[in-house]
Regions:
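Membrane-proximal interfacial segments on either side of biological membranes
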Residues: 1-77, 90-190
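Glycine-centered tight beta-turn/hairpin loop motif at sheet-sheet or coil-to-beta transitions
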Residues: 82-86, 190
Length: 190
């Protein structure tokens, strides 16, 4: 248990993660401190009962390689989960840990550049929207640590989104704050 994830997410995960890390810290006589962290792990012993594409049986190897590079005010966290899933993110260090921007790409060969604007971009494989909606209605976004801040703009792209017995192709969903609430824009090929 991490204590960082909402209960609905943490309850869907079980297992342990062996890992190896390297930390390098620079404390110059003049100038700012900096650090680099490399973490290698294997999620082989972890099972996930979350909806696809993050479902996983224990026993399936899933290597994770993460690199962190930062200073006293921010850090970048980038790496891979498996051979084809890559993440790149920038975090700000203040009174609260703030995810400034991030991009997750599946079926990719390398880490993508960070988005130009604050927000999160999720480039996912085909998804079952009903399963994900049920997860979020069950509290998956509740009880996020009060010590963390996440971007209000989220973009989700998927080649196929299935929901309510229908399939939509090349879907892009953008959620952002609007007057009086959250505004969601959807675009697709159909």
């Amino acid at each position: 248990r991490t204590g960082l994830l909402p209960k609905a997410l943490e309850g869907a995960l079980s297992g342990s993660v062996p890992w190896d890390g390297k930390v390098a810290i620079e404390l110059p006589y003049r100038g700012s401190a900096s650090y680099k962290v490399d973490v290698n792990a294997d999620l082989k012993n972890v099972s996930s009962h979350l909806p696809a594409p993050v479902d996983k049986q224990a026993g399936e190897p899933l290597p994770v390689n993460i690199k962190v590079d930062g200073g006293l005010s921010s850090f970048t966290l980038a790496g891979s989960v498996g051979a084809k899933n890559h993440i790149n993110s920038r975090w700000l260090l203040g009174h609260k840990l703030t995810l400034d921007r991030a991009i997750l790409t599946t079926d990719s060969k390398a880490v993508s550049p960070l988005p130009e604007q604050p927000g999160v971009e999720l480039n996912m494989p085909p998804m079952d929207g009903a399963q994900w909606l049920a997860l979020f209605q069950g509290g998956a976004a509740n009880d996020v640590s009060s010590n963390m801040v996440f971007p209000e703009q989220v973009t989700l792209r998927t080649p196929v989104l299935t929901m309510a017995g229908q399939s939509w192709n090349n879907v892009s969903l953008v959620s952002q704050p609007g007057a009086g609430g959250t505004k969601i824009e959807a675009q697709g090929r159909e």
